[in-house]
């Protein structure tokens, strides 16, 4: 049975640990960590059948087969290389960190050197399977349009740097239009999906992103349009926000659970 370490005990990390604890995923939850001690306490209070050790990443990788990063883009810079150097596989939730091409290239090189796997869940979108299939031929364009309630963008670097008053937004308002390379840095907690699209498709500098604040919404909406040699497809998903964090879509947590289940499952279905 795979031994798992979960680094980051926020919304996604907590849902993932609960899924393991309930027996939904047949792996062993060996260790967890979060820089906020209270987050660890809150997580452990929700676990009924397991009592994982609390280990920092350097110790965690000595005992597990797979580390799941659920912390932040900044954490990726330490967690991922440390994990791969220890010859452990890694699942990355904060995929937006890989807009840094140097980090992306270095990470892939380390993984190849040590024979490790890096897993990027689909997150809060649908359509990555189609995009991956389409990438076998030429892709002309990939566009992501994200709509969320204004409060979902609180604290985002782009909002802070531009002194945007989210409370003053009364109608549908475009906050950002640009490339994924800029979007994942401007809204690191909101559009990790742009990173997944970029890596699976035509890259961070060619993937277009539009971010809209809409106070009428109670769900997070992601629309994707892909055009290429194959033709064209559009997907739209309306996500319920995660109960503990409105910046995160519940589907993102479910995607992490599904990815881990697929890793542990001998039967593989789909692209």
Swiss-Prot record:
Xref: NCBIfam families: NAD_NadX (TIGR03855), PRK13303.1-3 (NF009828), PRK13303.1-4 (NF009829), PRK13304.1 (NF009830)
Catalysed transformations (reactions): L-aspartate + NADP(+) + H2O = oxaloacetate + NH4(+) + NADPH + H(+); L-aspartate + NAD(+) + H2O = oxaloacetate + NH4(+) + NADH + H(+)
Binding site for NAD(+): 124, 192
Signal peptide per UniProt: none
Lineage: Archaea, Methanobacteriati, Methanobacteriota, Stenosarchaea group, Methanomicrobia
Role description: Specifically catalyzes the NAD or NADP-dependent dehydrogenation of L-aspartate to iminoaspartate.
Family per record: Belongs to the L-aspartate dehydrogenase family.
Protein name: L-aspartate dehydrogenase
């Amino acid at each position: 049975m795979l031994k798992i370490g979960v680094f980051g005990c926020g919304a996604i990390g907590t849902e993932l640990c609960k899924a393991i604890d309930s027996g939904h995923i047949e792996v062993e939850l060996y260790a967890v960590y979060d820089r906020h001690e209270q987050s660890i306490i809150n997580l452990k209070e929700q676990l009924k059948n397991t009592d994982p050790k609390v280990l920092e990443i350097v110790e965690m990788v000595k005992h597990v087969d797979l580390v799941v990063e659920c912390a932040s883009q900044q954490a990726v810079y330490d967690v991922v290389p440390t994990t791969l150097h220890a010859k452990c596989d890694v699942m990355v939730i904060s995929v937006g960190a890989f807009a840094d091409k140097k980090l992306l290239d270095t990470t892939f090189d380390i993984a190849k050197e040590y024979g490790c796997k890096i897993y990027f869940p689909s997150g809060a979108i649908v359509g990555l399977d189609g995009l991956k299939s389409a990438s076998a031929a030429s892709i002309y364009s990939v566009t992501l349009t994200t709509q969320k309630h204004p409060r979902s963008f609180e604290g985002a670097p782009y909002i802070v740097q531009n002194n945007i008053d989210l409370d003053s937004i009364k109608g549908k308002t475009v906050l950002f239009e640009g490339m994924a390379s800029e979007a994942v840095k401007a809204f690191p907690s909101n559009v990790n999906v742009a990173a997944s699209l970029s890596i699976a498709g035509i890259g961070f500098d060619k993937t277009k992103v539009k971010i809209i604040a809409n106070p009428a919404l109670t769900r997070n909406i992601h629309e994707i349009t892909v055009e290429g040699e194959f033709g064209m497809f559009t997907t739209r998903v309306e996500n319920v926000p995660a109960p503990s964090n409105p910046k995160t879509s519940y589907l993102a947590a479910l995607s992490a659970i599904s990815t881990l289940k697929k890793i542990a499952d001998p039967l593989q279905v789909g692209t």
